[in-house]
Amino acid sequence: MKIVWSPQAADDLVENNKYIARENPDAAIAIVNNIYESRKRIREFPAQGRVVPEINQQDIREIFCGSYRIIYQIEAKRILILTIRHMKQKLTKDNL
């Protein structure tokens, strides 16, 4: 399945990276690399992620990558990464 990043998810990745890089550039690089590596798990086993409890829709799932939640939607021909949130950040439908 093809993986597509929503504009929101791409912005989240950039903003999270900038925030972390201010204090620890090496950690920022490692987190981005780990998030990109997580795409392989999502692509190979999209249903493996758990249903996002705040949304409670079967097609919207998440996997964890360190302290981050990668939230994605399983569609017929692609997987859409909706957002990347730190575990401490509140998630609402408006964030998707």
List where the protein language model places each region.
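Basic, Lys/Arg-enriched alpha-helical interface segments
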Residues: 2-59
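Enriched for short, Lys/Arg-rich terminal
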Residues: 65-68, 73-96
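Basic/aromatic recognition patch in beta-strand/loop cores that engages polyanionic ligands
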Residues: 47-77
